[in-house]
Amino acid sequence: EQQAKLIYDYWFTQFDFPDENGKPYCSSGGKMVWNEQLKRNIPENWNVVPLLKLVSWESNSQPPKSEFVYEPKEGYVRFIQNRDYDSDTHITYIPRTKNLSIVDRFDILMDKYGDAGAVRYGIEGAFNVALGKICVHNPNYREYIRSFLGSDGIYKFLHNSCMASTRASLSEANLAILNIVVPNEKIILDYENFLHKIRVSILKNKDETVELINLRDWLLPMLMNGQATIAD
């Protein structure tokens, strides 16, 4: 994750993305123009638009707890809760219905309460009411939008604006305040391809870690009670 943040900062905060010669754009004298909305210089021919021109916000309903089951079951789907991003100890499943919004592992979710504004991904299923989905209209923009929302400045802004409200909840109204720089199509595609490979690697490493933990938890009791031994 730190590597992804550094690349975003380099490309879209410092504007030192690779130019047509493979050199850092801004540091190599690439033309910058003043943008009145952002009160700063941005690369020539880049635009600034409201974030909600590129994304929409989606929420889910909360099923009754009586429908929860705690083992995989046909016709059921993983129920994603905020705590699942920190621990796998409370995995829950709910009936799959046509009214549920289902996300894949690369879709963007955000915390609405608690750590409001935190960006989440990596679990497939139906998300609960404490999370909101960021629906990116153009799939080629997904990694750029994820990085934008996950940047320190945007997270702090969204979190603080939620805490200042009477309901202390992230909503589409918070996102409506944000403007975002729109790079040219080549930069967007290059960034999407580059970052997607990093996300795949991150999820693969997480999966391997979970497998090792499960193996340890299965093997350790047998070693302790003598059901299994380690050969010399």
Regions found by a protein language model. Give the residues of each.
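Short amphipathic alpha-helical segments
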Residues: 38, 130-132, 174-178, 198
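Sequence-specific dsDNA recognition surfaces
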Residues: 32-38, 52-69, 75-107, 127-135
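Short coil/turn segments at secondary-structure boundaries
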Residues: 22-23, 64-72, 159-162
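Glycine-rich, mobile lid/loop segments that gate access to catalytic sites or pores
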Residues: 3-4, 8-15, 22-29
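Non-catalytic DNA-recognition/assembly elements of restriction-modification systems
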Residues: 1-7, 29-62, 185-231
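Acidic, glycine-rich low-complexity/disordered segments
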Residues: 15-18, 46
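A short beta-sheet element
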Residues: 81, 99-155, 159-173
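Extended non-membrane alpha-helical scaffolds
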Residues: 47, 71-72, 112, 138, ...
